[in-house]
Amino acid sequence: MKRRRLIFLITCFGLILPLSLPAWAEGLEGLKDLLYDKYEIDAYGFLEARSGLRLRDDPYEKDASINEIRLQTDLSRDFEWVELKIKFDLLGDLVSEEVDADLRDLNLSFSPLDIMDVKVGRQILTWGTGDLLFVADSFPKDWVSFFVGRDTEYLKAPSDAARMSLFFDFFNLDLVYIPKFNGSVYIDGSRLSYWNPMLGRIAGRDDVFHDHKPDDYGTDSEYALRLTKNIEGTELALYGYYGFWQTPEGVDPLIPVLIYPELSIFSASIRDALWGGIGHLEFGYYDSRDDRSGDNPNIRNSEFRFLAGFERELSQDFTGGIQYYLEYMQDYEKYERHLPEGINKKDEYRHVLTLRLTKLLMNQNLTLSFFTYYSPSDADGYMRPNVNYKINDKWTVEIGGNIFFGSDDHTFFGQFKENTNAYASLRFSY
């Protein structure tokens, strides 16, 4: 009965909201024109209704995976010597039953020298060569948004940072300073169920994780750099990071509470034309500084990571891409020896394969896409089918899914099986 009532409410929500969107749309267009004509402020954004439902019964979470109204506003003003950018979302979330504001950008950009660009404030940071796989990219992610069916834009979470880019004849250099650790939005049970190793079962809202996040300015800072060089079309890069694991990869057994151990990353990448497409390689060493000996079972070991990928156009308006990803745990014998009894053991090598297929139809207004992860070592995977149709320059409709599968409940993707969901959205862009 509860499920039927929820389906009825979601259906009503999906039918009634589109009727009110045209009135909202007209008002947003008028506001956009006013801001530019009177204040020379460029305004963009969208108004979106997005709704989704779990396809499996999950006793630990609500049946609705997503049910929200989102208004994004992107404002920018050029003051000749500096540009001000503000991007924020107003969100009415019927799953969490909250109204929230999400500030995604609030920064100043300027160029004090011909060879220097500076951006200070809240911003989205990203680098590396992977397609939804990350080795060099050590910046915050929002895994909850990714798994419940929000736009892929929301996988990248903002950082409060200062970024300086220097452009030399021989190479380019990016320096990033984050005065206080930001961290990723991880699966804690409040929205998505997960494998709880302490309970030895799937848990959710009945046992939400709690963490202790480093939050002292200056003391709990993050530092990152990237050095890039283009040699006749071949893109080379070296990366460095000094900070913390972006998700809580440790536990304080005395409290107990999840913690963010200290981490350094040293990585490199190459991207070049290959076999009529684009190929890329990425290597990384994750130095888990709080457990360099590898004998502390409460902190994730150091590891090597490797990523190789290739993408190309298979036919007109049809592209494909494949990737291979590897995690190799260092000091595996020590990890096995000190692992507490009853805790499921990780593999020394974790392999992941990905496939992306994208087809454009109807004058490229209809996009059919399919992205899947599969781990042969974990025997689990995750599929992301999506259909996006651009009705006109203003209106877009989208349907998609997040499909998890796996042989065991304790593997990375396998633990999310009960979170499998389908969603639909209607968006007006202004």
Label each PLM-derived region with a short phrase.
Residues S76-S193, E232, G406:
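Outer membrane beta-barrel
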Residues E80-I86, M116-V118, F170-L173, G233-L236, ...:
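Repeated loop/turn-to-beta-strand initiation elements of outer-membrane beta-barrel proteins
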Residues G45-L53, I86-L90, V120-R122, L175-P179, ...:
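Transmembrane beta-barrel strands of outer-membrane/channel proteins
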Residues K32-L55, R77, V82-I86, L368:
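Transmembrane beta-strand segments of Gram-negative outer membrane beta-barrel proteins
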Residues L357, I403, F416-Y430:
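Outer-membrane beta-barrel "beta-signal"
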Residues D78-E80, G243, R271-S293, P297-Y373:
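Detector for outer-membrane/organellar transmembrane beta-barrel domains
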Residues N67-T73, L103-L106, P158-A162, S221-L225, ...:
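Hydrophobic, lipid-facing positions within transmembrane beta-strands of outer-membrane proteins
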